[in-house]
Regions:
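Conserved segment of the helicase C-terminal RecA-like domain
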Residues: 93, 266, 270-281, 285-334
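Conserved interdomain linker/interface between the two RecA-like ATPase lobes of SF2 helicase motors
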Residues: 27-30, 46, 92-187, 223, ...
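Conserved ATPase-coupling elements of RecA-like P-loop NTPase cores
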Residues: 2-6, 47-53, 68-79, 106-107, ...
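C-terminal accessory/connector segments of nucleic-acid motor ATPases
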Residues: 235-245, 334-414
Length: 414
């Protein structure tokens, strides 16, 4: 996503004469020699603030833009919180951007955004028209389920305007080719053509020339039918070739596994989510567990159907029992809670800074007071196991629990 952000920022940075840089942890806290826009991942930010003594300020830092706050995890939260703490005496302005959430007030308070500067919109409030439809299934997660989903997926493609690009999200890389085969088979039977989804105005010679450039010739059977794939397991040159063909309209359908929804760099007139369950191996090869897609993943997939150039369609295929939950939050906005005490991120940070300078209990409480967790503990204490809305008391309890869990460096606290 950082590369996508850089691509989007490049034209604007050139207009204002600013240098655009994708920063690593070593250079992030240094003062730039010229007007600079720095793009950094949450993990890199936290690394930069964890591997050395925290600076009291960052010279020249005037604006921090936090994108995709709906994806706020413990690493993202702690990194931004520490950055807020060390810039509190500066005139640094924090701006947050997020998909629609059902209550953005605490997010705004966390970033010290004034109420007058807070803009909140419903998921339906967008300039671009987006049609959302859903279809439920009662077939268990299996090959039969995806064959059943191939029918409505094909019809959504077939009855859309000619040439409309299509993105299809499936649960795993292994499901990509079988889904493509099901779609091509449906296309051959229903449309009585051996060209699949290739537009009638595109010559076989042109497609053949592109197919000859594929390093993996097993992809030819799909690309020659207008279906491509995108995920890191595909050879980079083949991946870029298929992206290029997709952008030019030479192939119409791009199939993407769910884990790649964050990095797929294209949008489409039609986005289809074929299933919202995935299988994860637990505790060995013999134990498999079925999980549901997260709400943030689904929102990310839906966002690929929002285009500046025209209308979009979003088709959700899921199990019947999951539809109500997904529909509710797609309509009302995402719920937001802190994940900071559910993971080891906070413990790892304390251990890291302990190696560089003395840290006491109050220092940790001060750091926690700048977190989104502090806002939510005061607003929704029961979610975090507290009965009172006293922020200071609850944060002190969290630190005590943290010390007990860490044990080994507990003597560093007083």
């Amino acid at each position: 996503m950082a590369l996508e952000t850089i691509s989007e920022l490049r034209p604007g940075s050139q207009i204002i004469g600013a240098h655009l840089a994708y920063e690593g942890a070593d250079s992030l806290l240094t003062s730039p020699t010229s007007r600079t826009i720095r793009v950094v991942t949450a993990a890199t930010l936290l690394e930069a603030l964890s591997t050395r003594t925290l600076p009291t300020n960052i010279p020249g830092l005037r604006l921090v833009v936090c994108e995709n706050l709906e994806q706020l995890d413990s690493i993202y939260e702690l990194g931004v919180s520490l950055l807020r703490m060390i810039t509190q005496s500066n005139s640094t302005r924090f701006v947050g951007l997020s998909a629609s959430v059902n209550d953005p007030t605490d997010l705004a308070n966390w970033l010290d955004v004034e109420p007058a500067a807070l803009s909140s919109f419903r998921p339906q409030d967008r300039d671009q028209s987006l049609t959302v439809s859903s279809q439920t299934f009662t077939i268990p997660h299996s090959v039969s389920l995806f064959k059943a989903m191939a029918g409505p997926a094909h019809r959504a493609i077939q009855y859309s305007p000619s040439g409309s690009p299509v993105l299809i999200f499936v649960p795993s890389r292994g499901r990509c080719r079988s889904t493509a085969m099901d779609l091509v088979t449906r296309c051959t039977l229903d449309m009585e053509t051996a060209r699949g989804y290739i537009d009638v105005n595109i010559s076989d010679d042109l497609i053949g020339g592109y197919c000859a450039r594929l390093n993996d010739q097993t992809l030819v059977d799909f690309v020659s039918k207008g279906v491509g794939f995108f995920h890191p397991g595909i050879d980079k040159s083949d991946r870029n070739l298929m992206l290029g063909m997709y952008a030019e309209g030479l192939i119409r359908v791009l199939i993407v596994p769910k884990d790649s929804c964050w990095i797929v760099p294209v949008r489409a007139a039609i986005v289809i989510v074929m299933g919202t369950q995935f299988v994860q191996i637990q505790g060995g090869c013999d134990t498999r567990q079925i999980w549901e897609y997260s709400l943030t993943e689904l929102v990310r997939m839906q966002s690929r159907a929002v285009r500046h150039t025209g209308t979009g369609q979003f088709h959700l295929f899921c199990q019947a029992e999951a539809l109500q939950t997904y529909s509710r939050f797609l309509d009302d906005g995402l719920p937001m809670e802190s994940q900071l005490i559910e993971t080891k991120t906070l413990q790892k940070w304390v251990k890291a800074v302990f190696h560089h300078h003395h840290i006491d209990k109050q220092r940790v409480i001060d750091a926690l007071s700048f977190t989104f967790l502090a806002q939510r503990v005061a607003s929704n204490p029961s979610y975090y196991g507290f009965t009172k809305k006293n922020q200071d008391e609850n944060l002190s309890t969290i630190v005590d629990q943290l010390v007990e869990a860490m044990r080994e460096p507990a003597e560093a606290f007083s």
